[in-house]
């Protein structure tokens, strides 16, 4: 997909690809896990990192967190960011 920085993993690319264009989904970690083949725990851990780095947002509606791409995340998926942009995130 894209060139990753040191803190990123293949799981991150799977999450970002699933949530990104053309679908622009907002999903819970369990739904992301079912669609990517990674464990729910792994997805939850990586979503936390991606939220902290500004690539995902977390919506805690009714106590069930949903994740979706931020504008920064959309730019990453579109290939508009450099590795330097991500290293500073």
From Swiss-Prot:
It comes from the Viruses. InterPro entries: WH-like_DNA-bd_sf, WH_DNA-bd_sf. The keyword tRNA-binding does not apply. One of its GO terms (molecular function) is DNA-binding transcription repressor activity. Disulfide bonds: none annotated. Induction: Expressed in the lysogenic host. The keyword Transcription regulation applies. Residues 29-52 bind DNA. Gene3D superfamilies: Winged helix-like DNA-binding domain superfamily/Winged helix DNA-binding domain (1.10.10.10). Keywords: DNA-binding, Repressor, Transcription, Transcription regulation. Transcriptional repressor expressed under lysogenic conditions, which specifically binds the host DNA site 'RRGAAG'. The binding occurs cooperatively, probably as 2 copies of a dimer. Possibly prevents RNA polymerase access to the promoters for lytic cell cycle transcription. This is Repressor protein. The lineage of its organism: Viruses, Duplodnaviria, Heunggongvirae, Uroviricota, Caudoviricetes.
């Amino acid at each position: 997909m894209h060139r990753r920085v040191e803190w990123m993993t293949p799981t991150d690319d799977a999450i970002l690809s699933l949530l990104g264009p053309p679908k622009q989904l907002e999903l819970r970690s369990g739904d992301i896990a079912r669609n990517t083949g990674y464990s729910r725990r792994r997805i939850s851990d990586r979503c936390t990192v991606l939220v902290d780095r500004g690539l995902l947002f977390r919506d805690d509606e009714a106590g069930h967190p949903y994740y979706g791409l931020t504008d920064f995340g959309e730019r990453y998926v579109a290939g508009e960011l450099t590795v330097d942009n991500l290293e500073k995130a």
